[in-house]
A protein has these predicted regions:
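Catalytic phosphate/metal-binding cores of nucleic-acid and nucleotide-processing enzymes, i.e., regions
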Residues: 1-112
Length: 112
């Protein structure tokens, strides 16, 4: 498979996961959640918007352990860029199951 096709396939997989995450968050929270469509730009503010004062980063990695370690750190800088109080990462697991992943500090911020 050529490199361009591989990158496009990964982007499509990520876009689909972001749409799924936005739909799920809308359903469970009652907030109108949407994709930001601004991934990778300087001053990135996360993948999903709609939950007040919260930044959401989405990951759909084959290696979910890597996603659980990497994404909570990345979303923290996005939280700062957005000047939001809260940040969380949503990781898609095989079979379409989702988990919200936080650092201990991010979890504590939710408790305050």
């Amino acid at each position: 498979m050529c490199e361009g096709r591989k990158l496009n396939k990964q982007k499509n997989k990520g876009d689909k996961a972001e749409r799924e995450a936005a739909e799920l968050l809308t359903k469970v929270t009652g907030f109108e959640c949407k994709r930001t469509l601004a991934a990778g730009i300087p001053d990135d503010v996360g993948d999903i918007v709609g939950i007040p004062d919260c930044v959401i980063q989405v990951a759909n990695y084959k290696d979910t352990s890597t996603a659980c370690l990497k994404k909570p750190r990345e979303v923290e800088s996005q939280r700062e860029n957005a000047k939001a109080k809260y940040a969380a990462s949503m990781v898609r697991w095989r079979g379409g199951n989702w988990r919200v992943v936080l650092t201990v500090e991010q979890f504590n911020r939710f408790l305050q």
